[in-house]
Amino acid sequence: MKKLTMLVAAAFAMTSAMAQLNPMEPIPADKDVRTGKLENGMTYYIRHNEKPKGQADFHILHDVGAIQENDAQQGLAHFLEHMAFNGTKNLPGKQMIEYLEKVGVKFGANLNAGTSWDMTSYMMKDVPTSREGIIDSALLILHDWSHFIALQPEEIDSERGVIMEELRTRDN
C-alpha cells in the first residue's frame, strides 16, 4: 500500500509539474549566438566558446534526405554524403581527409556526416584554430560540401562497395 501511495504521489507531482509547461512557447534563443542570412539564402549561426581552448567545431546542414527520394533514388542522399569524403573541387581524392588528419582532426571521431529522412549533416569537430589558414580551410571544405563534391567515376565505384557492406551489416 505504501508503494502504491508513493507511486500515485509521484505521478501527481509529475503531472502538476508538466502542467506548468507551455509546449507552444518558443525555446529562448542563446544570447551569445550570432545569426544572419547570406545573399544566397544560407542561414548561419556562430557562437564563441572557450572550451576546448584553441579549437572550433564546424557543421553544415542541408535540407536533403531520404524523404525527397523517389523509389528509383532510394539511398542517393546517403550515397552523396559518403562521396563528400572522396574528393571535392578544391580537395580532390583523399586530400581533405589527409589534410584534416594532419592538423589533428580524425576521420570518424572528429570528421563525419549523417543522413536522416529530411537532412544531411556534415561536421568537423575539435579543429585546431591556432595555426594560420586552418579556419579558412575548414570554411572551404564546408563550401565544397555544399557545391562541389567531385563524383569521380572511380570513387563512385569504390564507394558503392562501402555502401553495400554498410547495408549488409545493418540488416544483420
Identify the meaning behind each predicted range.
Residues 52, 62-77, 81-172:
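Active-site-adjacent, His/Asp/Glu-enriched structural segments that form or flank metal-binding
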Residues 10-18:
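Hydrophobic h-region of N-terminal signal peptides that target proteins for export
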Residues 20-24, 42, 81-87:
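A broad, low-specificity signal for short, low-complexity segments enriched in glycine/proline
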Residues 2-9:
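Sec-dependent signal peptide recognition
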